[in-house]
Amino acid sequence: MSALRSYAAVSLLAAAVLPLGGSAEAGPVRNDRPLGAYDQQVVERVRARAAARLDDPACSRVLTDFKDRGGRTLESNLQPLGVSPSRYLLELSFVDGTRLPVCRNETVMMAVTPGVPRVFVCPQGVGRLNSRLSRVEFRSGSLAEAMVIHEMLHTLGLGENPPSTLEITERVRERCR
């Protein structure tokens, strides 16, 4: 197995879905810390490329592949907002996840509470600059894009386990080539 493939397999374990009522649940914006300038640039680059992928109908069908706990497709959860999947992703809030306990787990890249339109980006670690997402983008831009789309699906109500993190990311990668 190549080093990149091994890294990709490990990185697929990189998202955390916080339980409803968890520390990332919707709350006052004042608790959210903005990303540093470099990480904000990383998010903007990755998000723009991921949004371009979502403009392809084959990719945006991933919103019909999964359902929320109530049995609704993620596409049906997006429809009341009156925006395309790519526009939704471009408007989604990405914030600093440094204070989240789940980000202490070095395999977690980002964290979301299902149905809450906010993504927490985990740092590389204590005393290290930049986010884990920046490391993934450096090694595999397409994997970083799939991970951002994966997190977007959670913000539209997708839970996890089932489906597993690996199943979600692999489906995104299949649909959004």
Question: Locations of the language-model features?
Answer:
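N-terminal prepro-regions of secreted/extracellular proteins
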Residues: 5, 18-25
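Bacterial N-terminal signal peptides that target proteins for export
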Residues: 1-11
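Predominantly extracellular/secreted Zn2+-dependent metalloproteases
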Residues: 22-145, 155-177
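Walker B catalytic acidic pair
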Residues: 151
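Substrate/cofactor-recognition hotspot
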Residues: 148
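Bacterial N-terminal signal peptides
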Residues: 10-19
